[in-house]
Amino acid sequence: MVRYFRRRKFCRFTVEKIKEIDYKDLSMLKNYITESGKIVPSRITGTSARYQRQLARAIKRARYLSLLPYTDQHQ
């Protein structure tokens, strides 16, 4: 019987020693939202709970300031 092991997910922010997630860093924030505009959960990205909260707060602030769209397209 062959077992397949997934590679362990890691928190990118912990590795890079980032203190605070900035809402103005749109290129980084876009990596953590889906095409439809939803925030990707930490079980998918591997982000730790502390940084997931900061990430959600930064994305919501960027949406409020119209830096990021709430949804991809309105049709």
Swiss-Prot record:
From which source organism is this entry?
Buchnera aphidicola subsp. Baizongia pistaciae (strain Bp)
Classification of source organism: Bacteria, Pseudomonadati, Pseudomonadota, Gammaproteobacteria, Enterobacterales
Which protein is depicted? Small ribosomal subunit protein bS18
The biological processes this protein is annotated with in GO are: translation
Q: Which residues form the signal peptide?
A: none
**Function statement:** Binds as a heterodimer with protein bS6 to the central domain of the 16S rRNA, where it helps stabilize the platform of the 30S subunit.
Q: Which UniProt keywords apply?
A: Ribonucleoprotein, Ribosomal protein, RNA-binding, rRNA-binding
> Which InterPro entries does the entry link to?
Ribosomal_bS18, Ribosomal_bS18_CS, Ribosomal_bS18_sf
One annotated GO molecular function is: structural constituent of ribosome
Disulfide connectivity? none
The entry describes its oligomerization and partners as: Part of the 30S ribosomal subunit. Forms a tight heterodimer with protein bS6.
- The reply on keyword Ribosomal protein is yes
Pfam families according to UniProt: Ribosomal_S18
